[in-house]
Amino acid sequence: MDISTIIESDTHFEGDTSASITTQGGGAAANVATWLAHLGEDAYLVSRIGDDAHGDALQKEFNQYGVRHSGIKHPDEKTGIVVILVSPNGERTMFPDSGSNSKLSSNDLPPLDGFEAAYISGYPLINPRSRANVLAMIDQLKSAGITLIIDPGTVGALQKIPFQTIYEWLALFDVAILNESEALFISQRSELEAALTMLAAITPVVVVKRGSAGSASIREKNVITYMPADKVDALDTTGAGDAFTAGFISEWLRSKEIDSAMKVGGDNGRLCIQSIGARPPLGAIGKGK
């Protein structure tokens, strides 16, 4: 669950700052699942929620979006919450509490027959309480022949993890989707093309989200592609990267054309930043294509 605080003036620490506060569903994997549903895809969300008011609201929301899920609420566990501060220029700072998701395990996976791909947010890997169980889940997904896609997580979170460990995680995946600062940090390079080349030696397909500059990718034979972004005023950038990821996954699985996948990802991200929150508008579900 996301609690978004839209800051309307300069922040006065230890005092009052004018703001608009809203509550809405969030979480990287859940955001990607709802945007996939927006694009007409059959999405199943693997997560854990607590038996609380936030869990009730999220299950209702997933049902409205058409996102399949286990339907289980776990007693004596609290649903994860992220407090998001949104600056006057639309940029955000997040304070996450993963709650029940810290206990994710292979027992939370559905039967894997019929699934083509799995997107995994890096946050459960970064979280030491869920890491071992999530690595076991990845093992199970790989054994089932499912294409694996990762968004590794923010620089702030990844700074706690040794680089070699991050590289070992990335080597488990077929596609890595991350933003430019994350790509530069993980690769320990100062230039984007050098970062792409380094990361492509670990993960076969690497896609870098560049915000208003668009996106870039590298694939077999070190072919690098840039996709510009159409300009639009940003109301709230929360979830824009997740919306891009969903658009990319949807088109890439359909066509295996990275250029068109980057374009659909950018279109989806642009739609996201024109409203508050990380989810697509409910009235548009299944109408994104």
Task: Cite the ranges covered by each PLM segment.
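Ribokinase/PfkB-type carbohydrate-kinase core domain
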Residues: 60-74, 87-224
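Short, conserved phosphate/pyrophosphate- and ester-handling motifs at nucleotide-, phospho-/glycolipid
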Residues: 36, 179, 241
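Conserved phosphate-binding/catalytic region of the ribokinase-like
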Residues: 17, 140-143, 188-289
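Short acidic/glycine-enriched loop/turn segments that link adjacent beta-strands
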Residues: 77-80
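Glycine-rich phosphate/adenosyl-contacting loop at the front of the ribokinase-like
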Residues: 1-46, 53-60, 64, 234-235
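Short, glycine/acidic-enriched loop or turn micro-motifs at the edges of active sites
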Residues: 1, 5, 51, 154, ...
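Glycine-rich phosphate-binding loop at the start of an alpha helix
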Residues: 26-31, 135, 255, 259, ...
